[in-house]
Amino acid sequence: VSADEPLDAVLTALRSIFGTTDRLPGVAPGLFVPDPARWAPAAALAGDLLPVLLARAQRRWQAPPHVAASLGWKAYTYWLALPAMLGYATARRVPLLTGDAVLVHFDDPRPLVTLGLRPDVPVAVLPGDPFAGRPGVAVVAGEDELLAALRRSLLDQHLLPLLGALHGAVRIGRRVLLGSLASGMAYGLLRAGEPVGPVLTAMGLDGLIDVVPPGAVRRRTCCLAFTLPDPKICTDCCLPTRSCG
């Protein structure tokens, strides 16, 4: 993706935060997938690939099925949501990350799953954006409509089907999973200097995290990492403050 592409701002933000776009754990080098031959649509994670995802998660964390599912969801949704959060925060350009616009594979044994974006992933922008009118770029009326497009694509058309599939396969609560999503989205927004509240409210995820000075995230739910054979307390965990709910 060259400097005259709508999501160049996302790549710039990733380089600013991580120093690279080519060596992010579980993300395709450069974020985009030029050759989809060995990849599958991410929508398959809620179907045929769900057993693969769950088995990989259990082997990775040596955890009961519901704990492995929680941690797998947390890892996947952080890296999935990050391009959308950075695009919105830095340029008010939202890649529409539906289950068909995102590709995944399990060939690399190091991450749980590797994800990448199709080069022609649709992007929603505001009126007056320099990329308005280009093929694959949808112009929406204002900020509310931009956030609505984010919710439809990322949540309704991608993550809620996966959440439903996970919930049907293992005993894991919806609130636990949505708390991890809210936390991951908040981290992405804060990294880019963007207020968290409006985005989480638009996504229906408000009330799941708090932002505490100096700009840290405190969850109101627990990802269950403390139940691992080698227990872990995450930096944003609600357990130390007994604020889980």
PLM regions and their residue ranges:
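Generic N-terminal leader/targeting and pre-domain segments
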Residues: 1-71
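Contiguous N-terminal and early-domain "leader" segments and peripheral loops that mark the onset or edge
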Residues: 2-8, 93-96, 237
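Hydrophobic, aromatic-lined core segments that form the binding pocket/scaffold
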Residues: 42-215
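Short, surface-exposed linear patches
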Residues: 126, 244-245
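Local cysteine-cluster metal-coordination motifs and their immediate loop/turn environment
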Residues: 220-244
